[in-house]
């Protein structure tokens, strides 16, 4: 992958999935809200639970164990070391929707989108169950539905190839042959440290390990995560610049990357 790597060689990153939570209620006139069942109010409790799931510790001191638990061998015995390298999973509410007859009525439905970043040891099934097991979702079990979004946008031909909005975590050992090939080429060309065109570039590179991982998601989730084709990353630019309104890519990075690609056997 040639996504930005800040002068580093990246051997994996967290996966992600897109979750939808639907809450049903009963509408009524806003002058007597007690006659209805406000779906937005019920969803508000779910929103707070999702915040807690992302932010809480996992030491048993809170009702909801936070996602940091996957860095602990007690919760993630097979994959905790990879999880510590990739970083813990996260979740955040990214969208909210509602239906209501008017601004003077109780909302009869509310839905949210949840952006879920997944570390090693997490599956889409486990992530859905975490949401289903939130106290608020259990409290309103008969009125709540937790699901995964499906991608169904038509192609230019009009054909629809429906697929789940789930993009698997992927990681390689540093000793993997395709990773080591890039490391060896970098060592031969420029040594063991990240390089950059100027001080602005080096300000985010200096002191960081040459071999690392992305924080965001790349096409590696399909190349290796979904299809098992070995993938490794070395690309021009910086992660912090990606999708920014003033995004830049250093010309020297383009030259550096082209040289390394040419040097890889």
Feature-to-residue mapping (PLM):
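Acidic/histidine-rich catalytic neighborhood of metal-dependent amide-processing enzymes
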Residues: 1-18, 83
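Metal-dependent amide/peptide-bond hydrolase catalytic core
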Residues: 18-263
